[in-house]
Structures are given as structure tokens and as C-alpha cells.
Amino acid sequence: PEAVVDAAFRSVKKASELIDMRTHHGEHPRIGATDVLPLVPVSGVTLEECAEMARALAKRIADELAIPTYCYEAAALRPERRNLAVCRKGEYEALAQRITDPAEMPDFGGGEFTGQAARSGATVVGARDFLVAVNFNLNSTSTRRANAIAFDVREKGRPRREGNPITGRIVRDAEGNPVMIPGTLKGCKAIGWYIEEYGIAQVSMNITDIRATPLHVAFEEVCRQYLIRLRYAGQLP
């Protein structure tokens, strides 16, 4: 495991030398040149051990490379940061503001938006089990429809609204947080987007718990949602 961790550190260092986030644009959510770095227990190591190594790696990246880091999933130092989307909130463009906010700043290397942070962004380091990433192609160019399907199937679901389910006012709890309608697939995250290269919209999904939702179950549920709105056209690994 130590060799893997060292190789991961050197990869982050090389990415920081080659990639300048100040000129980066793209479709996929990201917060830094090395966006997310999970350690996965393949053999001879436990998830808990991976989490300890991930925290140490996150601190090393911040200390030696001056790249701010968040810890997520099993390595999270705050419960809400188990979710990658919470660490990535606002993406790279929001990092300059978040890095000085005590409630939002990185776990390591926060407090100042340095020149290195501006160039490399932040890195989210963690430990998790195996993840399945799959993109479902739609016979459509509509990002709105792709997102609607993603919101219906992802575990987080969609905000509850008053009246019109699309344009109605979002219902909030006593603390001002949106009240969510859970999606149909446990352990799944999904978003919809348009892929200009292919000329189609996609639902991009990460299955973070393949025991709760095997790939074939996700496939069948996404197809069911497609049939409600659109026509399924294929998938990419």
C-alpha cells in the first residue's frame, strides 16, 4: 500500500506541473487538476486502513505541494464531507471564496487562495469501495430531460416543489434546507449533460454501492425512466 500512496502523491505533483486550472473548462464537475483521489481496498488491506492512509496523503499533498485538500467517503473528517459533491461544491470557480470560509475551507491547506491553489485547485482524497461509472446515451439532445431522469434515479433525488414539480417553489425544512424526494436507486449518483462530440445527451452515473444497486438493476431502472420520456439509444462504459 505504501508504494501505491507514494505513486499517487507523485501523480498529483506531476498534474500540478502540467495542468493550469485557470484556463480549464469542461462538462464534468471538477475542483482541481487532480480532482478526486480515492484509495480502494483491493487486497491485503482494509477500508479503515485505506482511510488512515488517505488522510495522511491529503496532509502530505497540502504540506509539500501547497495544494489544498478535502477528505471524503471513509476518510472524511466531517460527516457531511463523506459525499464528494459536498467537497466539490461550486467546483474550482468557488474555491477562492470557500478556502477562507471556516465552514467551507479544505481539511488541509485552507485559509489563503495562494498562487499554487489558483493554478492547481484543490484535490479531494478519500477511501471507498469499488465504484462503477457508466454513461447512458439518450436519443435526445435535451440536457433538461437527461437531468430529469438523473434526478429521478439518483439516491439523493430531487427537491420537493409546491404545485408544479418543475417550476414550483422549493419546499424547505425549518432550517431552510430543501426537502428532497428520494430517487429510486440506492448508492447511486447521477447527472445529465449534453456531449457535443456525440451529438447526444447522457445520464452519467456513479454506482458507489454495487451491492445495493448492481449494474443490471441500474440499467433496467434507467431504461424504465427513459421509456417514460424518451427512447434508449445505447450505453458507454
Residue locations for each model-derived region?
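Long, contiguous binding/interaction regions
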Residues: 1-237
